[in-house]
Amino acid sequence: MLSELSTHDKIVGIKQLKKALAAGQTAKVFLALDADPKLTGPIAETCCGSGVPVEEVPTMAELGRACGIEVGAAAAALLR
């Protein structure tokens, strides 16, 4: 549920998300469906392998708004 992004600690962006996944700090990942699959695909695979739930969001703009930023976001995550 996107509203979780406004009430929990989060990270926004592919680079930060990759680091947090590697460190085991993510509780849930959000991926924009209109983002480049070359960027989001490896993240989805990592989440699947590590048991981190993934929620798909229709657009980068919608994900960016949910994160409280004025630009689109390809990926975001809730932190543990």
Regions found by a protein language model. Give the residues of each.
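Ribosome large-subunit tunnel/peptidyl-transferase-proximal elements
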Residues: M1-Q25, D36
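C-terminal structural segments of small proteins and small subunits
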Residues: T7, S50-R80
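Short, flexible micro-motifs
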Residues: Q16, A27, C67, V71
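Short secondary-structure boundary/capping segments within folded domains
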Residues: K19-A22, E45, C67-G68
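Amphipathic, hydrophobic secondary-structure cores in small proteins
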Residues: K28, P37-E55, E62
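Short aromatic/hydrophobic contact patches that present stacked aromatics
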Residues: K28-F30, A75
